[in-house]
């Protein structure tokens, strides 16, 4: 089973993606994780990508395509892809790769949240720069305000988590996703999921769909 999962900033798509990985034994491919790894390692490519994110801009397709296709070559099947593709050019790159390797996508899940909810969720996020632990000032606060529970380091807010940047990211995302959504609707694999509510509530909107797909595959 191969899955695409989308959602604007703060939609919780990565949290749901990891639940999907645990339940169905898929490989998790996250464009965000691949990008953050490059940034954390301070590579020239990472520094270039950080500059785009700090301005609230999307990273160029050529860079993202290279990261994703490189990962796909090592995985090939039974994966969930988080946050990719986001532009028509990325769709073309992905579709060309999948066609050349005889791979199909079973479902494209779009988790929707409003702009207001996106800002509330994302702007409250805090990151430990030392160990990578993630907190939220409202939903998952550290025991000592501003300090990591794991290593005690001072927590920081990522540049792209500031409210004004979140709003810009959200609007860019929604605009760019219009043709992507239309493409997967034509493929008859697009499913829109209400992302409002807690993690378990959203999960129970997703799980029955994937159980059905998995059971359908088992019967073929």
From Swiss-Prot:
Residues that, per the record, bind Zn(2+): 128, 131, 148, 151
Keyword hit for Zinc: yes
A GO term from the CC aspect: cytoplasm
One GO process term, biological-process aspect: AMP salvage
Record family assignment: Belongs to the adenylate kinase family.
Entry annotated with the keyword Metal-binding: yes
Gene3D superfamilies: P-loop containing nucleotide triphosphate hydrolases
Enzymatic reactions: AMP + ATP = 2 ADP
NCBIfam families in the record: adk, PRK00279.2-5
Coiled coil: none
Binding annotation for ATP: 10-15, 125, 134-135, 197
GO MF, one annotated term: zinc ion binding
Positions of region (NMP): 30-59
Enzyme class: transferase
Pathway: Purine metabolism; AMP biosynthesis via salvage pathway; AMP from ADP: step 1/1
UniProtKB keywords: ATP-binding, Cytoplasm, Kinase, Metal-binding, Nucleotide biosynthesis, Nucleotide-binding, Transferase, Zinc
Chief site of localization: cytoplasm
Binding residue positions for AMP: 31, 36, 57-59, 83-86, 90, 158, 169
Name of the protein described by the UniProt record: Adenylate kinase
EC nos: 2.7.4.3
Self-association state and partner proteins as the record states: Monomer.
Stretches the record annotates as LID: 124-161
PANTHER family (alphabetical): NUCLEOTIDE KINASE
Pfam families, alphabetized: ADK (PF00406), ADK_lid (PF05191)
Compartment(s) where it occurs, according to its Swiss-Prot or TrEMBL record: Cytoplasm
